[in-house]
Amino acid sequence: MSLVAIGINHKTATVDLREKVAFAPDRIHDAMKSLATHTQSGEAVIISTCNRTELYCNNGEEADVVQWLEDYHQLSHADVEPCLYQFKDQEAVKHLMRVSAGLDSLILGEPQILGQVKQSFVKAKEAGTVATTMDRLFQNTFSVAKKIRTETEIGAAAVSVAFAAVSMAKHIFSSLSTTQVLLVGAGETIELVARHLKDNGVKTMVVANRTISRAEAMCDEFGATAITLEQIPDFLPKADIVISSTASPLPILGKGMVEKALKQRRHQPMLLVDIAVPRDIEAEVADLDDAFLYTVDDLQSIIEQNMASRREAAEQAELIADDQSYQFMEWIRSLESVDSIREYRTQSMAIKDELVERAVNKLAQGGNSEQVLLELANKLTNKLIHAPTQALTAASRQGDLNSLGQLRTMLGLDKD
């Protein structure tokens, strides 16, 4: 039995190649069935995200899995092979654990990958390509990822601009659930900010954008209110937190607009986070009392400090992955003995049944019970020790002291 993992990711391949080896969600069930059949492994899980495509098989050969990937996507070996990484057994297990814990991610320690791995596992179960080994592997992996996040600081510090912006708000306000938030822009960064805010209990969000339809589409997901940029002065006085990220070449929030809003707020403090380049909020806003303005540069210094913290945590996480992958392989190796134990027990029972049947027949024919039992015991002993005796004799004749020592240990002859 051997575990195989092959894949490409953001570190080994360009976006162009990653797109070519990705698996469409509506085809991944059939793909996993095809992979399991092709490799005759019976078990296969495919993880396919924007940053990586990875194939995990049980009882497969690396070359067969690579061949299947190339054939499936109609790619040449010359295109794929230089970008591939391959792992086997404990290294394959450790790699999956590292991936799931965010140790192999573009952003070290990011939590989203664990959810993506879980989704891939669910799809594999739906496809019928998960049995005992893969089920145990992935369930163990999820536990290890949780252990790493619990016992280390790998996910504690913000390392994205969006997350850092929300983390700053959490430090300033005791509870985000009672705050009102104005988001300026409706791009990917603001969408990520909105998701973090919602996860942290924010209930009232307003999204201002030049194109109202784009803002409305985002608001549907987060239960927010969409407005145009021209409506910002009407909503700004109600905002405890303002986070802005647009592509505007000129500032959208000027000192005068913010000053007027603060007066209407009766000088209740306002946190403004400008994560746009060029700036969305005039730098002079920082001169206003009760206005606390932070820029992307302020956040970047926080992120750099946090990345250093995560790298330290990653060293601890690697040790956990090492230990847990070794323990999993011990379980795998224990499985390999099950068939041998079952076969040995069956063989011994067959010998016993044959000899007992003979003894019963002799007793039925009036044989002396003491002699019959003694003969049964002797024959049973001789048959059961025949194979070990031959092995001991062969090892001795060949001068194989290592095998001889192992046999003595297995037979319980060397007792401390």
From Swiss-Prot:
GO terms for biological process: protoporphyrinogen IX biosynthetic process from glutamate. Substrate binds at residues 49-52, 105, 110-112, 116. It catalyses: (S)-4-amino-5-oxopentanoate + tRNA(Glu) + NADP(+) = L-glutamyl-tRNA(Glu) + NADPH + H(+). The record marks 95 as: Important for activity. Keywords: NADP, Oxidoreductase, Porphyrin biosynthesis. Gene3D superfamilies: Glutamyl-tRNA reductase, N-terminal domain, NAD(P)-binding Rossmann-like Domain. PANTHER family: GLUTAMYL-TRNA REDUCTASE. Catalyzes the NADPH-dependent reduction of glutamyl-tRNA(Glu) to glutamate 1-semialdehyde (GSA). Homodimer. This is Glutamyl-tRNA reductase. It comes from Shewanella piezotolerans (strain WP3 / JCM 13877). The lineage of its organism: Bacteria, Pseudomonadati, Pseudomonadota, Gammaproteobacteria, Alteromonadales.
